[in-house]
Amino acid sequence: MRNMKVENIIKEKLSRRHLIKNAGKFAVGAAGLAVAASGGLSMLPSAEAAKKKSSTLPWPYKKFTPAEIKQAGEIAHDNWFKGFCSYATLSGIVEILRKKVGEPYLSFPMEITTFAHGGTSGWGATCGTLIGAGVAATLVAGPKTGEAINNEVINFYANTALPIYVPDHPKAEIKSQNVSNSPLCHLSVGKWMKKEGVGFLTPQQMERCARMASDMAMKTAELLNLWADGKFTPTVKAPVFANEIPSQNNCTDCHGADIPKTSGPFGTGLDLLKGGH
């Protein structure tokens, strides 16, 4: 009988010790369940919402102050020497929105546009600054309005004496501005180099192109601000509507007299050589 009492006392102590030892585990487990039930589970919809938000355009936008527009130019200028024209222009907009808005801009890989340097992989086609500007405008304003904004930026690029932007710390001194009459990298930089009297990949040419990225980033920010205020109104139509073919406004610079003719749905089937070119 005495042995049975001792045995029962030992079992009771062991049971109490086990309970005390595991009490902390039970508490942690209960706390974990409480967190999951309150905050943890609520994170799932938030994550899904963030994912949905990042995959749907347009993205959130907060207007740039005049100081931030200037900063966009500074960022674009500096980043040209890291990733060239398209990346530089895009980064001028996105880097500021990363600070002002956060996601989804924080997760956006700006390097996706580096291929567009030199008129797309060095082929001398559309200047990469315009591709970067178009991506930024589309992220913020959506595809339709983004394209209209980009069309305005292209018109500004082709018909303005550029570059305008002068950095506080230039990599080289340049003296010339030039109206390209074209969105093409080849014509734009080629005409400017001839006027400046320098060659390709000289410090002067690279500085010029960095400033072009600044000008396009700043112009894009200005137009996005107008859009945010409900005041953006397109002022020009893309040449395709006047020329009945995807085109620019100085075909003879490249084609001479051998310009493709067209007959399309936008007009009378004009000869591009006689159609204001």
Predicted feature residues:
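Small-residue-enriched, tightly packed secondary-structure blocks
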Residues: F84-A141
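A short glycine/serine-rich beta->alpha loop
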Residues: G73-G83, F115-G124, L201-Q205, V240
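N-terminal secretory signal peptides
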Residues: M1-H18
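Flexible linker/context regions in extracytoplasmic redox proteins
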Residues: E48-F64, E222-A228, V236-A238, G256-H277
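Polybasic, low-complexity association/targeting segments
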Residues: S55-F84
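The canonical Cys-X-X-Cys-His
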Residues: Q248-D258
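N-terminal twin-arginine translocation
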Residues: K13-H18, A30-K53
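Amphipathic alpha-helical interface segments
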Residues: G92-L97, A136-A137, N150-N225, F232-A242, ...
